[in-house]
Amino acid sequence: MSRTLSMRRRQRLEMYYKKVPSVFTVTSNQEESTLQLVNNKPVVIEPFRSSVVPLGVYLRCLPGYACMLLANTYRNVTFHPGLIDPTYMGELKLICNNRTDAYVVVPAGRLKVTVLAFTFLSPILTGPSVLSPPQYTDDAGYDLCLDQLVMVLPLKAFTFQLALTCPIQSKNFTPVVLGRSGLAAKGLSITPCKWKGDVLRLSMFNHTSETIILPEGSRLCQVVFMHNDHLPTIKPRILAAFLFQHRLMDMPFCQSRVSFIDIQKDPCTSTSTLFQDSTGNSISDATRGSKGLGSSGI
């Protein structure tokens, strides 16, 4: 037994999670490279507003790694691709939006959730920049703020163009634009995209029945510098669909080869260490802790 565990620890880096009772059940095996869940009870998605569904999972990422929270079910329900920052200690929550004007009931077994790990770069910003550094220590996302007021009409798609070049250029890392969980929880979704060239084109959708106003200077989205290995370029797209199981909206996505381990089933680690840093100290106020939804907070 001890020899098997020793061999396991030499094979891959490990991410520990804790599962508490919820309407979701973990379906992936111990040490798999993805954490997968499925609903064990019906989930109701309301129209004209976002539904925030707790998953009953607490996850501790490794230093230098963050995670993506992806989900899929019926086509008339969309999900916010959630960025789980390394120091986020709160319960993972899924933000759902309904494309119809009626309640959607997702029966048990039809809402599938996947958590994937990836590596990212935390560049140092020198001088004035269109990006703001992460709010909390070790966060992955850099904030992009509006230089003008923006209004998104109810139940409408809106495309917003910014004549901006990404201030950080890297051969090995790609700037990826993600929506903020705070806005997603209010009903405004942003389609993930790569930031290329000198124009940033953002696609948004207001799922609510009211106009959403974004004041000048407010945080619109976040930029994460993902390693190129996670974003393979495969053409044609139909081939990419066969080669890669996971997608970040339209982009094929490859996860890091880590092992997700249920800390309550692992004899090597105590549950008391899940919310401590590597020195054994409790998480400080400078880190995210349980603030927000694991992304930019609400």
From Swiss-Prot:
InterPro entries: dUTPase-like (IPR029054), dUTPase-like_sf (IPR036157), HSV_DUT (IPR034745). One of its GO terms (molecular function) is metal ion binding. It is an enzyme of class 3 (hydrolase). Its cofactor is Mg(2+). Substrate binds at residues 180-182. Its EC number is 3.6.1.23. It catalyses: dUTP + H2O = dUMP + diphosphate + H(+). Involved in nucleotide metabolism: produces dUMP, the immediate precursor of thymidine nucleotides and decreases the intracellular concentration of dUTP to avoid uracil incorporation into viral DNA. HAMAP family: HSV_DUT. This is Deoxyuridine 5'-triphosphate nucleotidohydrolase. It comes from Alcelaphine herpesvirus 1 (strain C500) (AlHV-1). The gene is DUT.
